[in-house]
């Protein structure tokens, strides 16, 4: 059991590292082929933040573990807001300045409501998967459009922060090297995650949904945690919040869409009745924190969000059938 736990942690870290290097390589390739840096920052990097969840969800679907993938999508969104935003605010209170973010928040809430309409009947169909993936494509087209608009205006704080984070060195050989390394690491790492998560689920008699909501969700959210804390410490507040918004949209559109397309079927009724409801509630709270005046997310809010995450875990354990068998 301890070996499985250690291998699961190593696998999650390798998935996160492989995703980071793949985004680095993709950014260099896009820059080499003349794609504007701001579009790279708002598309490639946005997808990269959710890449660990996407990869693990894809692997889970190929193994027929639909509830694990659904749990990872919903749990990652809850973790991103309650734990990651909460810890970032505890490290240093921050303010949301970007007009781009305030335009994206309603879309995050819209996608959250759409996800509820997909989950409410207790099953994911291929048509649901196609619909969600089309939503992801529309979202990408939208952020390309607002990236071009922000590039022309040139005075938005988020755009300045994203440009500062893009790699400025490295050519095609470096990009292809990291791309190759990532494509070797990530399949092995995801196999480690899925196999050892299954071992732990069997050992503790945990449901696949509960495992996805907790262990997998927290583990695959490590890149968002690192980005958020590094961002607020460097004063790049908007990129910390922007990554959470982008990750939450891609989690619902792609991390739910791929399993529906690959392994359609019934899902645990608790996914909608319990976990989706919590995710929608914390998404609304997140939006209100970003919209209110002044738009500062202080340590008080950080404490409330972090405590909310602990309460949610306690609710999973005490009030719901977290374990099966």
Which residues make up each language-model segment?
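Hydrophobic alpha-helical segments, chiefly the membrane-spanning helices
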Residues: 1-325
């Amino acid at each position: 059991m301890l070996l499985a736990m250690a291998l699961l942690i190593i696998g999650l870290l390798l998935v996160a590292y492989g995703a980071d290097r793949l985004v680095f390589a993709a950014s260099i390739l896009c820059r080499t082929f003349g794609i504007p840096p701001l579009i790279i920052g708002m598309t490639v990097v946005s997808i990269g933040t959710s890449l660990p969840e996407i990869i693990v969800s894809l692997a889970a679907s190929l193994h027929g573990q639909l509830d694990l993938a659904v749990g990872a999508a919903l749990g990652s969104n809850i973790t991103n807001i309650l734990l990651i935003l909460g810890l970032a605010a505890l490290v240093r209170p921050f303010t949301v300045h970007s007009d781009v973010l305030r335009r994206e928040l309603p879309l995050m809430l819209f996608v959250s409501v759409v996800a509820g309409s997909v989950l409410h009947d207790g099953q994911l169909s291929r048509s649901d998967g196609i619909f969600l993936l089309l939503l992801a494509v529309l979202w990408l087209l939208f952020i390309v459009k607002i990236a071009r608009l922000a590039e022309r205006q040139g005075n938005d704080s988020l755009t300045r922060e994203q440009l500062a984070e893009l790699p400025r060195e490295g050519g095609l050989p470096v990009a292809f090297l990291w791309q190759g390394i990532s494509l070797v690491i990530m399949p092995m790492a995801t196999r480690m995650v899925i196999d050892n998560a299954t071992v732990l689920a069997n050992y503790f008699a945990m449901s696949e949904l509960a495992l996805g909501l907790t262990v997998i969700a927290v583990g695959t959210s490590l890149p968002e945690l690192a980005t958020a804390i590094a961002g607020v410490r460097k004063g790049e507040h908007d990129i910390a919040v922007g990554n959470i918004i982008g990750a939450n949209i891609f989690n619902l559109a792609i991390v739910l869409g791929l399993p529906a397309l690959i392994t359609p079927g019934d899902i645990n009724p608790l996914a909608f009745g319990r976990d989706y409801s919590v995710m929608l509630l914390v998404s609304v709270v997140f939006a209100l924190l970003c919209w209110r005046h002044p738009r500062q997310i202080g340590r008080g809010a950080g404490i409330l969000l972090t405590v909310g995450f602990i309460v949610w875990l306690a609710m999973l354990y005490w009030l719901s059938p977290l374990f099966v068998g």
